[in-house]
Curated annotation (Swiss-Prot):
Binds 1 Mn(2+) ion per subunit. GO terms for cellular component: cytoplasm. This is Superoxide dismutase [Mn] 1. PANTHER family: 37S RIBOSOMAL PROTEIN S26, MITOCHONDRIAL, SMALL RIBOSOMAL SUBUNIT PROTEIN MS42. GO terms for biological process: removal of superoxide radicals. Its EC number is 1.15.1.1. One of its GO terms (molecular function) is metal ion binding. Homodimer. It is an enzyme of class 1 (oxidoreductase). Mn(2+) binds at residues 43, 98, 180, 184. Keywords: Manganese, Metal-binding, Oxidoreductase. It catalyses: 2 superoxide + 2 H(+) = H2O2 + O2.
Length: 218
């Protein structure tokens, strides 16, 4: 059995086994100069693909999970058999996080939040600049590897971070925007300058996509 996923782009059959790949919605150089082509290529084809491969391997033989989306799996880890729970947490989380990440980036991104999300950010944080400062702090101070997030938690916006590939979905929180702060996401271009990478993120955030996520979550 291979993972069923609602964003399947295409399937490649090798020796009767299906490998599920994900949509990558733009060219690898589309986010330059902020996110460079080589990093995005490796990030997508190597790192993200490894999470999918490992997740499919973990789910092999678990027909009871065949109809679960990756989001359902990471949101309900206690329902996943204990023998594969850690693998699903790490690799399912990595798959869900990266899938989300690609969809909130855009070559036409940047600027200001829009719609009700803009109003909610202003109300919660006082200003867009104050929000960016809090989000940047969450990303910069995440020790080791992890993610910075703007989430909806019990109907309210919240800035948070998660370690490794943990998903906010596991905590019952719904992501609105997220930033991968693993070194593989930025080291080729920014080396150890994580704050510079975080600053570049604001040039490629798709606020229309974030507004849609917010509307679905609140």
């Amino acid at each position: 059995m291979s993972l069923k996923w609602q964003y399947i782009n295409w399937e490649e059959y090798n020796n009767g086994k299906t490998r599920i790949y994900q949509i990558y919605p733009y060219a690898y150089d589309a986010l330059e100069p902020h996110f460079d082509k080589e990093t995005m290529n490796i990030h997508h084809t190597k790192h993200h693909n490894t999470y999918i491969t490992n997740l499919n391997a973990a789910l092999e033989g678990h027909a009871e999970l065949a109809d679960k989306s990756v989001e359902e799996l990471v949101a309900n880890l206690n329902e996943v058999p204990e023998a594969i729970r850690t693998a699903v947490r790490n690799n399912g989380g990595g798959h869900a996080n990266h899938t989300f990440f690609w969809t909130i980036l855009s070559p036409n991104g940047g600027g200001q939040p829009v719609g009700e999300l803009a109003t909610a950010i202003e109300a919660k944080f006082g200003s867009f600049d104050a929000f960016k400062e809090e989000f940047a702090k969450a990303g910069a101070t995440r020790f080791g590897s992890g993610w910075a997030w703007l989430v909806v938690n019990n109907g309210e916006l919240e800035v948070t971070s998660t370690p490794n590939q943990d998903s906010p979905l596991t905590e019952g929180k719904t992501p609105v925007i997220g930033l991968d702060v693993w070194e593989h996401a930025y080291y080729l271009n920014y080396q150890n300058r994580r704050p510079d990478y975080i600053g570049a993120f604001w040039n490629v955030v798709d606020w229309n996509a974030a507004e849609k996520r917010y509307q679905e979550a609140k």
